[in-house]
């Protein structure tokens, strides 16, 4: 499993797609799940990636079309604690303004446990200061610990 210590190219490589495979398996009978994010983009786009605004870098991984409607799905893999970078959180809030429900498919890779979290729930708890916070040692990126 790729971690925050790996660069973008490592994180999106085929060998690190455990979370995406679990997400696709979870939603396969719940509607049409369409790949939307950067993982399947042509390699030419990667060279421009650093110049993009954060809201585009943090686009959701999938769009789900089901009988209940359309939703954005972001898949996040983790071990022990789900850490949501604050910059991703801010970008997801922008995507959330499209009036399309936004969900995080959180996958605990070692335990093979999945949880679906509505972004609105995360926003409410973050605004109330209910999440512990931290920062990665390698790059200083701040995050919320989502429980």
List each model region and its residues:
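Intrinsically disordered, low-complexity terminal regions enriched in charged/polar residues
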Residues: 115-147
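Nuclease catalytic cores
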Residues: 1-24, 32
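Nucleic-acid nuclease catalytic cores
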Residues: 93-123
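A structural signal for short, well-ordered beta-strand segments and their strand-loop junctions
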Residues: 35-37, 72, 103-106
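Conserved catalytic cores of phosphodiester-cleaving nucleases, focusing on short active-site segments
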Residues: 27, 60-79
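Active-site metal-binding core of divalent-cation-utilizing nuclease and nuclease-like domains
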Residues: 6-13, 35-68
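Short phosphate-binding/catalytic loops that engage adenosine nucleotides
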Residues: 31-32, 100
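Active-site-adjacent loop/helix micro-motif of nuclease/hydrolase catalytic cores
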Residues: 79-89
């Amino acid at each position: 499993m790729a971690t925050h210590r790996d660069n973008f190219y490592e994180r999106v490589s085929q060998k690190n797609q455990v979370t995406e495979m679990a997400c696709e398996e979870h939603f396969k009978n719940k509607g049409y799940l369409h790949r939307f994010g950067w993982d399947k983009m042509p390699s030419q786009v990667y060279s421009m990636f650093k110049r993009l605004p954060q809201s585009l870098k943090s686009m959701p991984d999938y769009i789900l079309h089901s009988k209940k409607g359309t939703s954005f799905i972001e898949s996040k893999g983790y071990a022990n604690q789900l850490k949501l970078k604050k910059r991703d959180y801010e970008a997801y809030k922008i995507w959330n303004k499209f009036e399309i429900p936004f969900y995080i498919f959180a996958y605990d890779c070692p335990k093979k446990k999945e949880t679906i979290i509505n972004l609105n729930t995360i926003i409410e708890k973050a605004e109330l200061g209910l999440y512990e916070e931290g920062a990665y040692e390698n790059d200083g990126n701040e995050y919320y610990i989502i429980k």
